[in-house]
Amino acid sequence: GRFVSAALAQVPHLRAMLFDLPPVAELARARLASQGLAGRVTVHGGSFFDDALPGGADVATLVRVLFDHDDEHALAILRAVAAALPPGGTLLVAEPMADAPGAHAMGDAYFGFYLLAMGRGRARSFAEFSALLRAAGFDRIDRLRSRAPLLTGVITATR
């Protein structure tokens, strides 16, 4: 819920939906309510792999979600998001990237150790993300400039 609360703080007229695993969704619901944001965000508990994502959004975000999963599961998540977005809807992906501009070796080493410790997932290059996004039904894929390229790369894609 941290990304949602930050986005809502920046854009006063914005309304949001949050989808996360049920225990995380409950924590987010309580946190957002304590920040006075309950009236601007609808929280849904579920799993990308078992439940349909709620529809009705123009933009979906995946923030540090895909790098925890292998390609098969990452593609399943992207397909679920594509199914929930209307034609012309936008996906914003903020993830560690294997080819961080200006920090290739350092970023690859950092996330290599992180993912080794986690025992799963991987950082992907922009080309690898683009291939997964296309396979899930997205096009107009762009890499945006990030203020912290070592930690996060940002990609937009249109359904």
Placement of each model-derived feature along the sequence:
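Alpha-helical subdomain
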Residues: 2-159
